[in-house]
């Protein structure tokens, strides 16, 4: 039997909030120049990542429109772009085109440079931010990799390489799970449940972040309330509430309320609450241009916002999810991964993606701190997120790259 790659793409978004990184105040001018170059490289791939995000979201909705959806398009795209370094022919073309890159418009070197700088930006230290990504390459100890591939995944994608004895599947699982558990600060344990006996190579990607709301909710105002999953199902949820100044407005073309909430730093969460029966219309209409306008045209108004505390997750078989986007050959016996190793023919045996989203009141460094603001005396609108809504987490520093995309159908599941 031909050996196969078992590829676990792993992701944790532990998010009370999210903040990307800043340069230190005493950063030298050369550092600022370097950051500007990184930003420009990120800008080149940001539109492609945005298109990929919405394409994949719609595909996941098509496969299941009655469950929570949550994934990191940046994480998935990074992992497959890294894998593409070892592919050739149709396999190679399918991956890059499936991720939304037209190589007649952007050079492949620019694609990898964009991901390289994206990862550098995410992993830059900041005292307001816990945002880290990591790539791990786990190689069977008697498998010889092509030097060029090994060098490129290390240099372009900051991937660590580990020698593993895959014939001892329990030990291999322990090594891989330990790498992930450490990288996600213990938030994801036992990611790998089983390994195919023919596995000779595993690629693992994770992303972890946790941040703080710029304007937190007061936990004393959180009360149990109804959340309407659908016309026949209602669940009880802890509902956060705050009367204050919000970037919230009704968009008639989407038949939806749109709420933008900032995290400390350069990240923004966009929550979109459609009118009853308008979720499908919203999902078909939403695109990167509309989101771009929301992020550009910011204004606040007084509002009374109710938002559920939640912790949801999504686990996906990417073979099924990416098939309609044209990424198929890498999973088949016709896969050409000869850029990884010439020892044995390989195919991608398994690609699993997991993401977790947590939202609560926390938003200040000091426990029990109080946030106060002055609001106009006019009657504010009530915006109650007590039915399914869409959530998108954007990193403004990396040219509005969508870090996470999801739909909350049931906050209790």
UniProtKB/Swiss-Prot annotation:
Keywords, in A-Z order: Glycoprotein, Phosphoprotein, Protease inhibitor, Secreted, Serine protease inhibitor, Signal
Entry-annotated residues carrying Phosphoserine: 33, 378
Gene Ontology terms describing biological process: response to cytokine
InterPro entries: Serpin_dom, Serpin_fam, Serpin_sf, Serpin_sf_1, Serpin_sf_2
Glycosylation sites (chain numbering): 65, 102, 165, 266
Chain spans, region RCL: 368-387
Main location: secreted
UniProt signal peptide: 1-24
A single Gene Ontology CC term: extracellular space
GO molecular function, one term: serine-type endopeptidase inhibitor activity
Coiled coil segments of this chain: none
Site entry (Reactive bond), positions: 377-378
SS bonds (residue pairs): none
Domain comment as written in the entry: The reactive center loop (RCL) extends out from the body of the protein and directs binding to the target protease. The protease cleaves the serpin at the reactive site within the RCL, establishing a covalent linkage between the serpin reactive site and the active site of the protease. The resulting inactive serpin-protease complex is highly stable.
Oligomer and partners: Interacts with CELA2A. Interacts with ERGIC3 and LMAN1/ERGIC53. Interacts with PRSS1/Trypsin.
Protein name per UniProt: Alpha-1-antitrypsin
Protein source organism: Mesocricetus auratus
């Amino acid at each position: 039997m031909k050996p196969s790659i078992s590829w676990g793409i792993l992701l944790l978004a532990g998010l009370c909030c999210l903040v990307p990184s800043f340069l230190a105040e005493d950063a030298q001018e050369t550092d600022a120049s370097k950051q500007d170059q990184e930003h420009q490289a990120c800008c080149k791939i940001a539109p492609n990542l945005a298109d990929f995000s919405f394409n994949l979201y719609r595909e996941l909705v098509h496969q299941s429109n009655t469950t929570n959806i949550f994934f990191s398009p940046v994480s998935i795209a990074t992992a497959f772009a890294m894998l593409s370094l070892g592919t050739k022919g149709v396999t190679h073309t399918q991956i890059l085109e499936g991720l939304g890159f037209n190589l007649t418009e952007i050079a492949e070197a620019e694609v990898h440079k964009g991901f390289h700088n994206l990862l550098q930006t995410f992993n830059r230290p900041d005292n307001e931010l816990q945002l880290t990504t990591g790539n791990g390459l786990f190689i069977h100890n008697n498998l010889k990799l092509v030097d060029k591939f090994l060098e490129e995944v290390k240099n372009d994608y900051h991937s660590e390489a580990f020698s593993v004895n895959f014939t001892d599947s329990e030990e291999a699982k322990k090594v891989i799970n330990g790498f992930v558990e450490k990288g996600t600060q213990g938030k994801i344990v036992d990611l790998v449940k089983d390994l195919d006996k023919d596995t000779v190579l595993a690629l693992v990607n994770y992303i972890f972040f946790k941040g703080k709301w710029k304007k937190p909710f007061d936990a004393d105002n959180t009360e149990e309330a109804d959340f309407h999953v659908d016309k026949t199902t209602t669940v009880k949820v802890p509902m956060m509430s705050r009367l204050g100044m919000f970037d919230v407005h009704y968009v008639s073309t989407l038949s939806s309320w749109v709420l933008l909430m900032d995290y400390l730093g350069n990240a923004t969460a966009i929550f979109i609450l459609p009118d009853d029966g308008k979720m499908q219309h919203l999902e078909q209409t939403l695109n990167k241009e509309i989101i771009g306008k929301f992020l550009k045209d910011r204004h606040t108004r007084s509002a009374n916002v109710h938002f559920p505390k939640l912790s949801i997750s999504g686990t996906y078989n990417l073979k099924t999810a990416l098939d309609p986007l044209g990424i198929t050959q890498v999973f088949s016996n016709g896969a050409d991964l000869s850029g990884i190793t010439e020892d044995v023919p390989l195919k991608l045996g398994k690609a699993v993606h997991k993401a977790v989203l947590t939202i609560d009141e926390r938003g200040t460094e000091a426990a029990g701190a109080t946030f106060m603001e002055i609001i106009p005396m006019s009657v504010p609108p009530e915006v109650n997120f007590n039915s399914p809504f869409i959530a998108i987490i954007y990193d403004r520093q990396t040219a509005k790259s969508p870090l996470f995309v999801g739909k909350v159908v049931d906050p209790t599941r």
